[in-house]
Amino acid sequence: MARIAGIDLPNNKQLQIALTSIYGIGRSRALEICKKTGILPEKRAKDLDNEEVNKLRKIIESDYVVEGKLRSELAMSIKRLMDIACYRGLRHRKGLPLRGQRTKTNARTRKGKRKTVANKKIAAK
């Protein structure tokens, strides 16, 4: 089992798919990495030898920001926006959409579960 960037690659998957299990690597980056290392993207992860795993590990660690470092960079970026109190930072703080989407209806994913407010009862005549 190949272990790259602290993640065990799934054995039975093709290398181009297995690499996407690493946070920060998608399909296009996975193909790019395969091309740089000269390993066939269709090769199964279980068929990689130590030399190929070391090549992959070396390229990923030197050229790409992945896993924990990427997560912390994103968190720091969001924290900076919140600290300088810009519009995007305020929207992050309130848990609302950032990019101009409507919030009167929709935006449920960002706002969370509905919070019902009791209606005022109409006075009986």
Swiss-Prot record:
It holds the Pfam family Ribosomal_S13. It comes from Borrelia duttonii (strain Ly). It comes from the Bacteria. The lineage of its organism: Bacteria, Pseudomonadati, Spirochaetota, Spirochaetia, Spirochaetales. Keywords: Ribonucleoprotein, Ribosomal protein, RNA-binding, rRNA-binding, tRNA-binding. One of its GO terms (cellular component) is small ribosomal subunit. NCBIfam families: uS13_bact (TIGR03631). This is Small ribosomal subunit protein uS13. The keyword Transmembrane does not apply. Part of the 30S ribosomal subunit. Forms a loose heterodimer with protein S19. Forms two bridges to the 50S subunit in the 70S ribosome. Located at the top of the head of the 30S subunit, it contacts several helices of the 16S rRNA. In the 70S ribosome it contacts the 23S rRNA (bridge B1a) and protein L5 of the 50S subunit (bridge B1b), connecting the 2 subunits; these bridges are implicated in subunit movement. Contacts the tRNAs in the A and P-sites. Residues 101-125 are annotated as: Disordered. Gene3D superfamilies: 1.10.8.50, 30s ribosomal protein s13, domain 2. HAMAP family: Ribosomal_uS13. GO terms for molecular function: rRNA binding; structural constituent of ribosome; tRNA binding. Belongs to the universal ribosomal protein uS13 family. The gene is rpsM. One of its GO terms (biological process) is translation.
